[in-house]
Amino acid sequence: MANLQERKSFSKPRISIQASGGTPEAKGIEKRKLSQKRRTLPLQLSLGGHLSPWPTYTSGQTVLHNRKPCSDDSRNRANSCQQQSMSISKPKYLEQLENYLRKELLLLDLSTDSAQELRLQPYREIFEFFIEDFKTYKPLLSSIKNAYEVMLAHQKERIRSLEPLKAKIVTMNEDCSERVLAMRAEERYEISVLKKEKMNLLKLIDKKNEEKISLQSEVAKLRRSLAEEYLRYLTERDARKILIGDLNELRYQQEDMSLAQTPGVWGEDPVKLTLALKMTRQDLTRTQMELNTMKANSGDVVPRRDLEMQEKTNMELQEQLESLKADYEEVQKEHELLLQLHMSTLKERDQFYNELQEIQRTSTPRPDWTKCESIIAGGPERWLVLAEGKNSDQLVDVLLEEIGMGLLREKDFFPGLGFGDAIPPFLRFDGPVKNKKPSKKEVVNLLKDAWKERIAEEQKEPFPDFFFNFLERRFGVNDAMAWAYTIFENIKLFRSSEIMNQFYAVLMGKNLESVYINQKKTLSHLLKELLSVDTQNEGSITMEQFSTILKTTFPLKKEEQIQELMEAVGWGPDSSNTDMLNYRSLFNEDEEGQSEPFVQRLWEQYESDKEAYLEELKQELDLDPLEDVTLLKMRGTLMNIDPTMDKQTLSAYLSQAYQIPAIDVPLEDEEKQGIISIKVETALDRLRMADTKRVGPREPDPAS
């Protein structure tokens, strides 16, 4: 009982200390009482001044031997061990500690905010007892206790620092809840308004339907009355015709009767005849006098018909004179322009002549390209094929490609470029990478397969990531990096290959992939138009039909460009419109992906048209390349040089130039358009990357 009273006295100050907020005096009292506990409690809980060795004396009995787990022997041993363990009692020291801990926990006041800290205090005291009693393990136990105390202090400090964040989160949660409730109330109000509007519209529709039904009935009634009136009119018309016929017959009968009853002419009165003759003679005399007077008065008068003819002739001559004057003035202006052009041509001729003299004086001799025949693999025959139709600059590129191909073949490994931000994602690797050494044909076929898969892909990912994923799917994860380096080095080298050059431009971000895709769509559309004309499916059409299809498919091309395309397919001065053309061969590609001259000419014209369009845009902006141009000015300039451009294309061009989503382009908000700006040079470079082209003619057709 004395021990119990003493332990109760220990527990009461603990509650008061925790509730007091932890003042220095309270902490000192707590330390003193804790030291008293440490002095008294071990004396009470020990057995004769010595600690109980439990359960150390049972350790020798708990050694496991290699036995079968399910055998009878193992079961018997397990039962005997359980009986022995149940017969062994706990040490008195351990029991007193457990009773003390249980009573201390029952005496705690857990209704306060610091209940968990109060609950931890008895365990801390028990641990202090262990530290004081077990002298051998005191350093280790003290370090464990200190580590836990430091961790608890750190956690408390962290909880205290997170309290403002918790309050802020609660406040934000309340604000968001209020906003959600407000939005829901607003939505409910809008829904009610829409429902009312819907009911009003339904009522209006019912009213209109009733009016429609009444009007239909009225129209039907009017049609019936019109039919009745028409029948009555027909009846009256027939009756009128009958009456007219009867009336004519009666009149003829009356005339016949009057002729039968009329006396002869000679039965007239002679006096009346004499008087009538006299009056007739007077009228004749008066008429002759008037005729003579008119002849005398109109002797010098010109007939009106002749006057009108002369006036008409005079007007025609006057118009011809005005036309000739205008033609003369126009010819005079053209003559002056030709004189100026002649003078400028003379100046250019002199300038070119001087430049020619300077070039002839300073330039080196023209290289003898036939020396390359013995160096290039394949001999003179292959060199003739490579050099056909190429100038010196292009021949240098061909020679560099052949030399580079040989050097590329000699390499067994490529050095890894590392993991820098400037390195493309598909080339980020550290260490040597094996050169797969594919042929040019294999690289071209691989690029074609990549384009096919890219076009068929629904969810678009960045092109470099797609390229590397494609290689992983094709060659596996282990060989994907080696193929990436190999293909990259090949497409970087073979710039004369059309498909490699385009793939390299898209891969390095110099062109958008829409340029290549739209080019293929244009060729497919042209082939479809040619197939529609070839009704017999013979694979050939006339030159005239081909020219007509080119003009309808490319309405914005000039006559000179159409003529260039015609020459690319074999049109010459001696050709006839009836000559047949095998149009299918125009779209063929060789095994290295090289297109026919017709497709190459189309691509060259596309590039030149794009450059001309961007140059016209630059001239129309009339700004320095490093100056900023607003979205408003860019939009107005695009509409000036391309008036027929639709809103979708305009949004796409502005989105590409200013790098904002097409749906976010503020076409209707001029204030926002005046805020968004970018450098002219940057905008033109971005438009040059995309499929930028003229939509319609510069000046729209007035008839359209």
Swiss-Prot record:
Keyword field contains Translocase: no
Q: Where in the cell is it found?
A: Cytoplasm, Perinuclear region
- Asked whether the keyword Coiled coil is assigned, the reply is yes
Sequence segments annotated as region (Disordered): 1-37
- A Pfam family cross-referenced in the UniProt record is TSNAXIP1_N
Regarding tissue, the record states: Specifically expressed in testes. Predominantly detected in the post-meiotic stages of germ cells.
> What does the protein in this record do?
Possible role in spermatogenesis.
> What protein does this entry describe?
Translin-associated factor X-interacting protein 1
Species this chain originates from = Mus musculus (Mouse)
